[in-house]
Amino acid sequence: MKPFKALTARQQEVYDLLKRHLENTGMPPTRAEISKELGFRSPNAAEEHLKALARKGVIEIISGTSRGIRLLLEESESDENQGLPLVGRVAAGEPILAEQHIEGTYQVDANMFKPQANFLLKVYGQSMKNIGILDGDLLAVHSTKDVRNGQIVVARIEDEVTVKRLERKGSVIYLHAENEEFAPIVVDLNQQPNFEIEGIAVGIIRNNAWM
């Protein structure tokens, strides 16, 4: 892959923390969380490092939200890289990666994400805007059914696919938006058998940056 501009040791620490936090929680850390984790005296120090990473093209800072940070990727030069499939509309009862659901392929190295991404899903709407997942974004997804409370998951109810924060209490699933204008989706597994967890969010890509 094309390299980013060289990072200082401290900038690399911040970048690695961003990736690790996304992997563990499905969302970027706040400035306060970065400062606490890396021992900065104030969130302002974290902000300065984030601005430096943005100038080097490694991340994008989204104003208006405390978690408005996106990791940006460089396009792979390898002809052997098959890229990641973009999943479109999904029919009930069929695998999410069935051929008829694939709208195209984006030349993104799956190994840039931890854990590895298996597919991309286009985001519709503003239900997750408070953590920087915006309408039109491409969400990188790791296929797994092994999920934890608090993770950002891709869930399927019948033929509807949604991206939400997971909370499970017994047989009841709560899918929480990151936007106070949206109520949680409540799924009782005893009454809704056509419910599947398709994976966890492992990154975000701007839709207009790739193809």
UniProtKB/Swiss-Prot annotation:
Keywords: Autocatalytic cleavage, DNA damage, DNA repair, DNA replication, DNA-binding, Hydrolase, Repressor, SOS response, Transcription, Transcription regulation
Pfam families in UniProt: LexA_DNA_bind, Peptidase_S24
Biological process terms in GO annotation: DNA repair; DNA replication; negative regulation of DNA-templated transcription; proteolysis; SOS response
Keyword Transcription: yes
E.C. numbers: 3.4.21.88
Catalytic residue list: S127, K164
Hydrolase is among the record's keywords: yes
SUPFAM superfamilies attached to this UniProt entry: LexA/Signal peptidase, Winged helix' DNA-binding domain
One GO MF term attached to the UniProt entry: serine-type endopeptidase activity
InterPro entries registered for this protein in UniProt: LexA, LexA-like, LexA/Signal_pep-like_sf, LexA_DNA-bd_dom, LexA_repressor, Peptidase_S24_LexA, Peptidase_S24_S26A/B/C, WH-like_DNA-bd_sf
DNA-binding residue intervals: 31-51
Site (Cleavage): A92, G93
Catalytic activity: Hydrolysis of Ala-|-Gly bond in repressor LexA
Subunit structure: Homodimer.
HAMAP family named among the record's database cross-references: LexA
Functional summary from the UniProt entry: Represses a number of genes involved in the response to DNA damage (SOS response), including recA and lexA. In the presence of single-stranded DNA, RecA interacts with LexA causing an autocatalytic cleavage which disrupts the DNA-binding part of LexA, leading to derepression of the SOS regulon and eventually DNA repair.
Protein family: Belongs to the peptidase S24 family.
Protein name as it appears in the record: LexA repressor
